[in-house]
Curated annotation (Swiss-Prot):
The active site is at E54 (proton acceptor). Glycans are attached at N189, N209, N259. CDD domains: O-FucT-2. This is GDP-fucose protein O-fucosyltransferase 2. Residues 1-21 form the signal peptide.
Length: 429
């Protein structure tokens, strides 16, 4: 009976987080074994999320910013980054396919990520910390007064929330929210931080102003890069190696439809990204033109710098002639009607079109990665103005060692006589 009473006491402790008798703070979600042994790991957990409308490729950029913050934290304490599960993205519109709570291992190689910073999947966090509790949620926002012209100042302050919170308290005064589709997850405290500056600006606050073991930064896109384009940036970007099964699908497609293999294309790919240090221009690329043609909602806000289908095809044919290529691979989000029109104008185009079973397996994010992988290996690539999808292909080609002249190219709008081409961000080792 005494044992049963002790179990109930432990359950009560898990439900309500008072300070322990020893004076140490009790962490919600701690397991009974942790309490009994007192040997729970003291490493702290950093979680984050991004504004819901933001797409897959911008979220990959936010990961790089958060990785910089984690590296700063690791100089003082033991932290680990909890990877935010993928799901509910606007551009993932394939019907009847479950696309929520997707772990990062579906899209990226976790051992590669871990060579750069310590990372774990969200479900491992739940298992390690003893339950689906996040001690402190900080919602990042701009300053209400805005930025006044003059000297740029990096700063962070706890401020009243400007917008209505997307979190609500339950009867236990825990906070419910989206939490990547994990309905059982609760936040214990939610407050707002006004931020202006690079990601590491919040490090002192996380180290000194809160003792929370698990901290989530919501709206993390409000943080800027610590050193965009520097060695640290490229180390993190290089560590974001695509999952092997997606690379293999892309490689098989290249071989079968585009007469392209790493050996023939002089692509020096290695599984260990830390061993890949390639001289730019040393890679040749496959005997095809790679094209990323953004359509759908994108053209509404970019009517001046995105071509019509006819204008795009004229440019494609010109490039194929110039570079003596008779194959063209097209990655596009065009709706069925536009795609059929494009196919009529460019009957020789090749596209990766998964079966329903393949789509269910790889999901929209996996298909996007396969498209990018194939475009990254092309002899010459042309993308869409200010598209993060095209930006990620630029980076992938830079990592593979292709000539920048064959990488940093974009379509001009029909009315643009000459348009500014993308900036070359040179890889740094």
């Amino acid at each position: 009976m005494a044992t049963l009473s002790f179990v109930f006491l432990l359950l009560g402790a898990v439900s309500w987080p008072p300070a322990s008798a020893s004076g140490q703070e009790f962490w919600p979600g701690q397991s009974a074994a942790d309490i009994l042994s007192g040997a729970a790991s003291r490493r702290r957990y950093l979680l984050y999320d991004v504004n819901p409308p933001e797409g897959f490729n911008l979220r990959r950029d936010v990961y790089i910013r958060i990785a910089s913050l984690l590296k700063t934290l690791l100089k003082t304490e033991e932290w680990v980054l909890v990877l935010p599960p993928w799901g509910r993205l606007y551009h993932w519109q394939s019907p009847d396919i479950h696309q929520v709570r997707i772990p990062w291992s579906e899209f990226f190689d976790l051992p590669s990520l871990n060579k750069n910073i310590p990372v774990i999947e969200y479900e491992q966090f739940i298992a390690e910390s003893g339950g689906p509790f996040i001690d402190q949620v900080y919602v990042l926002q701009s300053y209400a007064e805005g930025w006044k012209e003059g000297t740029w100042e990096e700063k962070v302050d706890e401020r009243p929330c400007i917008d209505q919170l997307l979190y609500s308290q339950d009867k236990h005064e825990y906070y419910r929210g989206w939490f990547w589709g994990y309905e059982e997850t609760r936040g214990l405290n939610v407050s707002c931080l006004s931020v202006q500056g690079s990601a590491s600006i919040v490090a002192p606050l996380l180290l000194r102003n809160t003792s929370a073991r698990s901290v989530m930064l919501d709206r993390a896109e409000n943080l800027l890069h610590d050193h965009y384009g520097g060695k640290e940036y490229w180390d993190t970007r290089r560590s974001m190696v695509f999952a092997r099964h997606l690379r293999e699908v892309g490689d098989e497609f290249r071989s079968r439809h585009l007469n392209s293999t790493d050996d023939a294309d002089r692509i020096p790919f290695q599984e260990d990204w830390m061993k890949m240090k390639v001289k730019l221009g040393s890679a040749l690329g496959g005997p095809y033109l790679g094209v990323h043609l953004r359509r759908k909602d994108f053209i509404w806000g970019h009517r001046q710098d995105v071509p019509s289908l006819e204008g795009a095809v004229r440019k494609i044919r010109s490039l194929m002639k110039t570079h003596r290529l008779d194959k063209v691979f097209v990655a596009t989000d065009a709706v069925r009607k536009e795609y059929e029109e494009l196919k009529k104008l460019l009957p020789e185009m090749v596209r990766f079109e998964p079966t329903w079973e393949e789509l269910e397996l790889y999901k929209d994010g996996g298909v996007a990665i396969i498209d990018q992988w194939i475009c990254a290996h092309a002899r010459f690539f042309i993308g869409t103005s200010v598209s993060t999808f095209s930006f990620r292909i630029h980076e992938e080609r830079e990592i593979l060692g292709l000539d920048p002249k064959t990488t940093y190219n974009r379509f001009c709008g029909d009315q643009e006589k000459a348009c500014e081409q993308p900036t070359h961000w040179k890889i740094t080792y």
